[in-house]
Amino acid sequence: KKNRIDLNAKYRDEKYWKETPKIAFFQDEYHYCEERLNFINESNINYVYSCVPERSLNEIYGKNTNAEFLFESLTGYVEDSLIASANALRKPFDQRSIDIGYRARPLPYYNGRGAQEKTRIGEQFIELVDDPNLELDIKMGEEDRIYGKDWHRFIANCKGMLGVEAGTSIFDIDGTAEAKCNAYLAQHPDASFEEVHEAVLEPYEDKVFYRTISPRAFECAAFKTCMILFEGSYNGILEPHKHYIPLKKDFSNLDQVLKTFHDEEKRNQIVENAYEDLIASGEYSYKKFIEDFDTTLNLTSSDSWKDRLKLYLVEQMLGLFKKLGQIKYFLKLILNLVRPPLERLEMRVRFYFAVSLFILKNISFILKNK
């Protein structure tokens, strides 16, 4: 099947391949699940980085694979090239000719109601907005998609942009949702999404939460384009009214959304908040991600766990009060380390207990001597 990762069987059997720590990054995990799970087990993958939220990682990967370490990651981070492009192309608001822009494309019905939001927000916005003072450039056709530098120029020319959470609301772990959907459409080729959803898809809806912040949010923040988004969690990164103007999914607050957008002071504050927190902070840069990634490997490599942990503590605890972001990540990492499936936990419980005591002792020492 397309998008399937395959490795030469002989290569996977090599001794060094089996003994070397292996890391896999996954996105678009809502289909081809069985192939992915088999790949992890057959290839002896040790680390899985996934867009599945932390609370569901064990349900999907912990119970179905032998991977030792499971981590949530984003679909993308802030590249230096994005910042450079934004700095070169960004326009003052009064020089942008498009008030609100958007691009999307239809997704298969079997991806669920969440996936249909990507076109629905644009379709309903066009239908419901009756404001002659707004210049809209909202299109949902495959032929209307924009790529590369042209996409950056488009964002730079928009004062605002619509958006929804990335991901889907149906996580088709065994492929049955797709199969039933396709079978129904074969018999009813003109069926609407609502008809197909009611007939076969409803039981699969929202069983696994698989929604995430889109890289488009970072792009809009970098170009200082105001985001008008459907309400959502956005990985806890975006806050409504602070980083974006929240639009209810039934459009019941559309008038208030437009009022806020037309309020230059409020709109500019939202834009600046998004830029400072998502871009200028560096918190979501690839550089920061790689630093955290390296920390993870150092802490969890099989050789000399204790020595590496002590070294990390010496380096990080001294900066305890200066790098609050590191504390947040460190605690999150420790929580991830103690969340393998219970059947694999027994052999490690004494070690984790000792590590926890060591950490608490060092934190207590630093707090007392600060």
Predicted regions and their residues:
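Short amphipathic alpha-helical segments and helix-helix/interface helices
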Residues: 9-15, 36-40, 122-126, 151-152, ...
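A structural motif corresponding to the C-terminal end of an alpha-helix
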Residues: 14-21, 125-136, 220-224
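Extended catalytic core of nucleotide-activated donor transferases of GT-like folds
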Residues: 1-66, 81-87
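Membrane-proximal basic amphipathic "stem/tether" segments
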Residues: 306-370
